[in-house]
Amino acid sequence: MQFLKYLLILAILMLLSGNIYSQELSTSAVSGLWDKLDKEIINGTIDKSDAEDLMEEYEPYVIRYFKEQNGKTVKKSEWVFPLNNYTSIYYRENGNDYRDENYDYFQGSNTKGHPAHDIMILDDNKDLLDDSTLKPVDIVSMSSGVVVATDTTWDIGSLLRGGKYVKIFDVTNNGLFYYSHISVVSVKPGDVVNAGDKIGEVGRTGRKAILKPGKTHLHVSFLISENGYPVPEEFITELRYAEKNNNLNNK
């Protein structure tokens, strides 16, 4: 009888803890939890299956939060170019730098491949300013979504590959945008952004980007969520289309 009472008490405590956890997830706090998870993935301090389960669990709460905050729907055809206030840009390897072979999101900071595009700005002296305007080049969100992870602490000597970064969950297109090598991060986890909102400034942060051969650029990727598993997707067509529209609008 005593043992049965113990089991009953234990069951009640587990139910209560589960309810408390769900209440936490039902608020904007879920972005803070995602940010914490993101750093555990990068540092390799969490099991892959556990990380995948948590991402799958967090996503519905992020989507709900986005809708509660009246986030705007932005289709792929409405994506905007991720840079603003620049004189000229060019793509690494003319946009042929996307490689997703052997890539796995849960490899953390030691991911293989390059499932992204690098966009260089005009900065020959590498002072992080556009050589013509003498001003920083803004990074803007390509779509709408919720900021779920950032890094603002990177410093020289850090082994973090992407340096300072921003990750935004695109609710409309069920995917994750990753912007990295940022010099100044302008958003925080929990922020709801629209297409064109400033999220940072182009830089050279990161364990390789900061080295002498490194160029001032933005590294940007888009990953479709498949039940919590971020799978990279080639998006050069959408990127060039957005660039073309940006150039037309700035004439």
Q: Can you name each region flagged by the protein language model?
A:
Residues 1-8:
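Bacterial N-terminal signal peptides that target proteins for export
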Residues 159-168, 191-251:
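Conserved, short, structured surface segments that act as functional micro-motifs
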Residues 9-10, 20:
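Cleavable N-terminal signal peptides
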Residues 133-136, 140-183, 213-217:
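Zn2+-dependent peptidoglycan hydrolase active-site motif and core
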Residues 22-138, 238-251:
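Polar/charged, compositionally biased leader and regulatory segments
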Residues 117-131, 175, 180-182, 222-232:
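Small beta-barrel nucleic-acid-binding modules, principally OB-folds
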Residues 138-150, 187-202:
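Short, well-structured beta-strand-loop connectors
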